[in-house]
């Protein structure tokens, strides 16, 4: 749908491209200790090794799956109804929440009463919000610190292990060479974890202990029961976030829901709705009700819309109402720029690009207009009270992040980081889950300093970075400039990477841009997991490499992050089905394929009863004799 077309709720439908299963993949569920803990994963099937190479079976591998029910052919998807409330029973049985008779937010009530919005409204708005009972704290951190292992924690533990034990067992029982295959395909380089403590197997107790310490969060608002629990922390798989959202210049509710379903199809672990245009409240409701992943927002954006874009007119009362409005819709984490202090603003005067964070610039303007600290800072404990009543996590915003390589690691950025560490202590006093946002634009040699200082000042609270971009010279390719920095800082310990699309600095991303950003950042996150030595991270690489060596082209495509593009590139030059079993590609052709030559050496060794190194030596002798007999000319006329 184009932005100019009218969105009508009754006609809303899911994007068909987002619900089709990926090639040779199917949704499976691993059951936990109770029947309603069913953890989704994607199973990728593989063909057997060709008879000429041993004819051994290649069991399916299992990969992390963020797509919710959208890629499950057995699920009935109707975005007008929203997703099933997966966690509803878990929330209710804890007995510490109550269903409200009406919305608590004044703005929320006014939108609900506006009949002119009926055609836009999500049909399920009869849903009543939920809040903690008086004096109760419903955060996962609070439960963890009381020693409780929640169903969410067990769910996360199963999810992080990615059914690795079942895969290893399937290798061992695959045939006479099973033990050898298991050893070969689970081999992994040790990695360098820079102090992370990653166990061989993730247990529910380990999840609980990490959440209790503040080293990980499970962003699960009690008003977003549709979400599938996931975890963000340096001792877990590196996660990625996708930003979506409309602006005053374009996009519609339909397009933003499509972007969300598209982002999670390709691997977005969380989605941030950064809408600044029309109907922000209604757009967010549609996204949350249809999202199986946590949704984040920057509440100050909507608060600013309520005062017609005049930052100096913002008040604590308007912001508080916005927090409650969004918490009761089900937002799982809020970016709040409470670390932008009055004394830091002059430090940005000599920057090349000043304050580039929208939230940071809004609060800097407010501080200067009132010549005092922002209400985000002075009311921080009041904000904590709201967060723990709904289990909304803090994403403490880096409002003074560098917007250019020139400004990297300056006093303003690092001063704010120290303040974010102090605010983390306050949030933890209230048992509110917290992550810390980071830069930005940073050259490669300064990236590790960012990670080290964050660990020091913020006491290992999860780091969440935008890239960082490692150079400023490539508009249109900033998914690559930032992907370089993302892989690096993910290796050093960043828990979640915020994607950057090719449109960064240039315009609002469309669906294809979202996919490009997601794939780039899934690659960066996976590279970081490999470098850290995360258990099982190399399984997919090993499986794909084996498929490549055995010329199982379809398996190569399907084991990759983007099967569609891999197949498209291959078929540009070799489109026929016969090319899918050929022992070469268009890069080297049939006579110069290094992998085919290696296989020929192995076949020769087996035929002659030789070891591979002996076969190479003997083969060279034979070729030398042929060379001399042919006239010993380096070049021959043909």
Swiss-Prot record:
Co-factor requirement: [4Fe-4S] cluster
Cofactor binding, per record: Binds 1 [4Fe-4S] cluster per subunit. The cluster is coordinated with 3 cysteines and an exchangeable S-adenosyl-L-methionine.
Residues reported to bind Zn(2+): 441, 505
Binding-site positions, [4Fe-4S] cluster: 585, 588, 593
InterPro entries referenced in this protein's UniProt entry, alphabetically: ThiC, ThiC-associated_dom, ThiC/Bza_core_dom, ThiC/BzaA/B
Keywords from the UniProt entry: 4Fe-4S, Iron, Iron-sulfur, Lyase, Metal-binding, S-adenosyl-L-methionine, Thiamine biosynthesis, Zinc
Binding site for substrate: 243, 272, 301, 337, 357-359, 398-401, 437, 464
Pfam families reported in the protein's UniProt record: ThiC-associated (PF13667), ThiC_Rad_SAM (PF01964)
Catalytic activity: 5-amino-1-(5-phospho-beta-D-ribosyl)imidazole + S-adenosyl-L-methionine = 4-amino-2-methyl-5-(phosphooxymethyl)pyrimidine + CO + 5'-deoxyadenosine + formate + L-methionine + 3 H(+)
Gene3D superfamilies attached to this UniProt entry: 6.10.250.620, Radical SAM ThiC family, central domain (3.20.20.540)
GO BP field: thiamine biosynthetic process; thiamine diphosphate biosynthetic process
Functional pathway: Cofactor biosynthesis; thiamine diphosphate biosynthesis
Superkingdom in the source lineage: Bacteria
Stored HAMAP family: ThiC (MF_00089)
Family: Belongs to the ThiC family.
Quaternary organization: Homodimer.
Protein name: Phosphomethylpyrimidine synthase
Species: Aromatoleum aromaticum (strain DSM 19018 / LMG 30748 / EbN1)
Lineage: Bacteria, Pseudomonadati, Pseudomonadota, Betaproteobacteria, Rhodocyclales
Gene from which the chain derives: thiC
């Amino acid at each position: 749908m184009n932005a100019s077309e009218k969105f009508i709720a009754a006609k809303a439908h899911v994007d068909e491209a987002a619900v089709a299963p990926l090639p040779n993949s199917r949704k499976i569920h691993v059951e936990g200790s109770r029947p309603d803990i069913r953890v989704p994963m994607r199973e990728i099937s593989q063909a057997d090794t060709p008879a000429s190479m041993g004819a051994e079976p290649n069991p399916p591998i299992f990969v992390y799956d963020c797509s919710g029910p959208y890629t499950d052919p057995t699920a009935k998807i109707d975005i007008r109804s929203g997703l099933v409330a997966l966690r509803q029973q878990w929330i209710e049985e804890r007995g510490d929440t109550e269903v409200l008779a009406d919305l608590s937010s004044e703005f929320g009530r006014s939108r609900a009463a506006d009949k002119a919005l009926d055609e836009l409204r999500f049909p399920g708005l009869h849903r009543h919000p939920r809040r903690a009972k008086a004096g109760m704290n419903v955060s996962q951190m609070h439960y963890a610190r009381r020693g409780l292992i929640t169903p969410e924690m067990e769910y996360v533990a199963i999810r992080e292990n990615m059914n690795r034990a079942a895969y290893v067992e399937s290798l061992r029982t695959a045939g006479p060479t099973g033990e050898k295959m298991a050893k070969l395909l689970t081999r992994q380089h040790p990695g360098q974890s820079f102090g992370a403590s990653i166990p061989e197997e993730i247990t529910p107790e380990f999840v609980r202990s990490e959440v209790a310490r503040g080293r990980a969060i499970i962003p699960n608002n009690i008003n977003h029961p549709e979400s599938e629990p996931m975890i963000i922390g340096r001792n877990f798989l590196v996660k990625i976030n996708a930003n979506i959202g409309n602006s005053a210049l374009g996009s519609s509710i339909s397009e933003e829901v499509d972007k969300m379903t598209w982002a999670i199809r390709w691997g977005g672990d969380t989605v941030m709705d950064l809408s600044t245009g029309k109907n922000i409240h209604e757009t967010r409701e549609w996204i949350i009700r249809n999202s199986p992943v946590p949704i984040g927002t920057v509440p100050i954006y909507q608060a600013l819309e309520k005062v017609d874009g005049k930052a100096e007119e913002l008040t604590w009362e308007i912001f508080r109402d916005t927090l409650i409005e969004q918490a009761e819709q089900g937002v799982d984490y809020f970016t709040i720029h409470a670390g932008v202090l009055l004394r830091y603003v002059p430090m940005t005067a000599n920057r090349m690009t000043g304050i580039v964070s929208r939230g940071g610039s809004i609060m800097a303007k407010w501080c200067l207009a009132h010549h005092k600290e922002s209400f985000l800072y002075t009311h921080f404990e009041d904000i904590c009270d709201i967060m723990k009543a709904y289990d909304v996590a803090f994403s403490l915003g880096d409002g003074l992040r560098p917007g250019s390589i020139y400004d990297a690691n300056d006093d303003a950025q690092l001063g704010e980081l120290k303040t974010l560490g102090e605010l983390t202590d306050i949030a933890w006093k209230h048992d509110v889950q917290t992550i810390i946002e980071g830069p930005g634009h940073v050259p490669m040699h300064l990236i590790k300093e960012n990670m080290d200082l964050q660990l020091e000042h913020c006491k290992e609270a999860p780091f969440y970075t935008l890239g960082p971009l490692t150079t400023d010279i490539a508009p249109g390719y900033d998914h690559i400039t930032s992907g370089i920095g993302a892989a690096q800082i993910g290796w050093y310990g960043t828990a979640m990477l915020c994607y950057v699309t090719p449109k960064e600095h240039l315009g609002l991303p469309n669906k294809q841009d979202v996919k490009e950003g997601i794939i780039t950042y899934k690659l960066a996150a996976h590279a970081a997991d490999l470098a850290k030595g995360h258990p099982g991270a190399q399984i997919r690489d090993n499986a794909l490499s084996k498929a490549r060596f055995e010329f199982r082209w379809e398996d190569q495509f399907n084991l990759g992050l983007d099967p569609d593009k891999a197949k498209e590139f291959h078929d540009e030059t070799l489109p026929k089905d016969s090319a899918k079993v050929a022992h070469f590609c268009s890069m080297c052709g049939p006579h110069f394929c290094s992998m085919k030559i290696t296989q020929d050496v192995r076949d020769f060794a087996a035929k002659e009863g030789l070891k591979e190194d002996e076969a190479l030596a003997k083969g060279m002798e034979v070729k030398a004799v042929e060379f001399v007999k042919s006239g010993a000319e380096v070049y021959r006329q043909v």
